[in-house]
């Protein structure tokens, strides 16, 4: 079961990698790629990053730069036209990215026709006219401490933050001030965060994050603070230790390393986080955050 599951995940991601190679000049929206791979849009990007070792955006940008390197080697197309074809709006931005990738500016690269390029974990490079047969996955997640838990639905009061992920503190301050003043924090409720957009993908100004506190059935929305229900069911739980701004690495290992080897798939619902200690009184390196990923049995029919 586990070997089949891992191979299934690899096949689905390989399908996406092949599609990207063949449609490098398309918009390549994450929703479209998620549908192509039969993944929930909530989770596709983290699974992709965890298995491939780079985000979709990073992968596409690198392939376009590799294509640009080939064009510089072969022809006389102007550097600015090659830059525009690679998705850059200026010669300067293209030159910076190209030099970072190949160790030489485009004009220098064209003269010497060779330069260093970074080794990538996946082993996937721009190869026009060839069929992508396999890719190397990131080796991770096998040593993670993960528990499967069945949760009851949780009723939560929440405030929604729209904006940079690192600015959610003000939303939490507002939520806890109101809830504390109204006497709803006395029973040690759980503090949950639901990030409905991936900070590595969504523009900072559009990230939606719900700061949540568990409440009982007697709590009523009061205008500013609303109520929602976090779905019950089976969840995989792992604990992230350390700064909140390093949560992305744990997500990548969890969903791109552990999950494909677990025999499970994710439901079409967001992950959520439970904050186990107070950032106001805890050293950043000692912060503990439980990550819950919603599970469903993996289908045997593909």
Give the ranges of each region predicted by the language model.
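Short, Lys/Arg-enriched, Trp-marked, Pro/Gly-tolerant hinge/linker segments that flank
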Residues: 1-18, 37, 54-55, 61
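Basic, amphipathic alpha-helical hairpins
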Residues: 15-28, 48, 69-78, 98
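Central "turn" residue of the DNA-binding helix-turn-helix
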Residues: 32-39, 53, 76, 87-89
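The alpha-helix within a helix-turn-helix
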Residues: 34, 83-84, 95
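Short hydrophobic/aromatic patch on the recognition helix
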Residues: 42-44, 48, 93-94, 98
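Conserved MFS/SLC helix-loop-helix module at the cytosolic interface between two early adjacent transmembrane helices
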Residues: 47-49, 56-57
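A solvent-exposed interaction/effector surface
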Residues: 54, 66, 70-74, 78-80, ...
């Amino acid at each position: 079961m586990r070997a089949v599951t891992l191979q299934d995940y690899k096949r689905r991601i390989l399908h996406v990698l092949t599609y990207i190679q063949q449609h490098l000049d398309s918009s390549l929206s994450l929703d479209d790629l998620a549908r192509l791979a039969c993944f929930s849009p909530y989770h596709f990007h983290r699974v992709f990053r965890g298995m491939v070792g780079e985000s979709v955006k990073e992968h596409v940008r690198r392939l376009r730069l590799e294509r640009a390197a080939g064009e510089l080697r072969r022809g006389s197309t102007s550097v600015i036209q090659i830059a525009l074809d690679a998705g850059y709006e200026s010669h300067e931005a293209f030159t910076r990215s190209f030099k970072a990738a190949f160790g030489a500016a485009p004009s220098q690269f064209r003269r010497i026709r060779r330069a260093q390029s970074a080794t990538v974990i996946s082993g996937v490079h721009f190869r026009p006219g060839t069929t992508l047969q396999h890719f190397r996955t990131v080796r991770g997640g096998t040593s993670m401490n993960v528990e499967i838990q069945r949760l009851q639905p949780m009723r939560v009061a929440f405030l929604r933050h729209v904006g940079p992920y690192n600015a959610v503190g003000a939303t939490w301050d507002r939520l806890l001030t109101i809830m504390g003043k109204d006497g709803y924090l006395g029973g040690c409720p759980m503090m949950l965060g639901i990030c409905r957009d991936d900070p590595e993908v969504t523009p900072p100004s559009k990230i939606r994050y719900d700061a949540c506190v568990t409440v009982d059935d007697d709590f009523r929305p009061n205008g500013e603070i609303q109520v929602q229900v976090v779905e019950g069911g089976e969840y995989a739980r792992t604990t992230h230790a350390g700064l909140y701004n390093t949560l992305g690495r744990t997500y990548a290992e969890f969903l791109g390393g552990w999950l494909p080897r677990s025999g499970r798939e994710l439901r079409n619902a967001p992950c959520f986080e439970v904050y186990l200690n107070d950032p106001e009184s805890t050293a950043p390196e000692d912060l503990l955050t439980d990550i819950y990923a919603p599970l469903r049995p993996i289908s045997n029919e593909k």
